[in-house]
Amino acid sequence: MKLWSCLLAIGLLTLGGCGRSRHRVLEVAYVSAPQATLRDQVAAIYNRVGTVKNGERVEIVDREKRFARVRTATGIEGWIEQRYLVDQKTFDGLQKLTQDNQNAPVQAPGILRNETNLHITPGRETEHLYQLASGSKVSILKRATAEKQATSVKLPAKPTEAKESLRASSGPALEDWFLVRDAEGRVGWVLSRMVDVDVPLDIAQYAEGQRFVAFFVLDEVQDGDKKVPQYLCLLTEPHDGSPYDYDQVRVFTWNVRKHRYETAYREHGLEGVLPVTVTQESFGKEGTLPVFILQVKDNSGNTIDRKYKLNTPIVRRVLAPGEVPARPARPLRKRR
């Protein structure tokens, strides 16, 4: 009797040990595919035991070649291709990116043209986790460039050096990327050509072949029974890889008498960098006026601030003490 009891105890301990080994957690992973099937075995013929969705947390309990056996939060276990999973480091990186840009100012709203992945850094081959649906609305925060099919970000030391690199036929092809925030507050990098900057139609028609990068409402004017916004717009040439985020600034004000937008101010030849600050400031007898501050690079590649004020319909530079303008501001009333 004692012998049988001992054998039974040893058998139970052995089975328990095997069970723990079979179901031990190797690591935590997250599903990067829009949706993936869990299969009961790694074979050409299998049964579906469950489904996991994008961003879902799973525990890896076993691996076999290109497959991983995972356990979901509900306890379902099954095999999934490892290419549909990303590790904890990638998840933590996206969480940090979101936290670091939680309060980053919005430069423009955008709409996704296609299903798009949120990457942890600019580049088509960089790690990504979340996938956004076509038509999703996002907030554009920043811009960067990356080499096509490369993971490294192109960060030119000086604008002049970058321009020479772009002109060189042997130079790498660059793509523009936007740092965006989605409706759920998640932040990541997306290929800029996948995003349409959601510019109001009333001013989009004045693009003149240039690309809108960002726009801001400076203030509103009363026209009859409605208020009409007046805009600051940042534009650039319609190609990727520029060493600056924008090179043109335009201000569109509303002509109350003619009921139309007019170009109150434009400036070219800038090497502007996002973000742009829009605020209000008191100017004594002029009252409280809309103010915008641009960050631009000088000839040495240093980033400096340039402040402007709008006293409708005139835009003027606001010079810092001792500052001398390189060239006078040129207010315009010509319709574009």
Please describe what each predicted stretch is.
Residues 65-71, 146-157:
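Short, Lys/Arg- and Gly-enriched loop/turn segments at beta-strand edges
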Residues 19-33, 59, 71-110, 154-227, ...:
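Boundary regions of SH3-family modules and the immediately adjacent low-complexity/disordered segments
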Residues 228-242, 287-298:
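Short beta-strand elements that form the blades of beta-propeller/WD-repeat-like
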Residues 25-26, 40-63, 120-143, 149:
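SH3/SH3-like (including bacterial SH3b) beta-barrel domains
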Residues 38-40, 106-109, 113-121, 141, ...:
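Core beta-strand residues in small-molecule sensory/regulatory alpha/beta domains
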Residues 265-336:
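Hydrophilic extracytoplasmic domains
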Residues 14-17:
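C-terminal motif of bacterial Sec signal peptides marking the signal peptidase cleavage site
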Residues 1-5:
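Positively charged n-region of N-terminal signal peptides that target proteins for export
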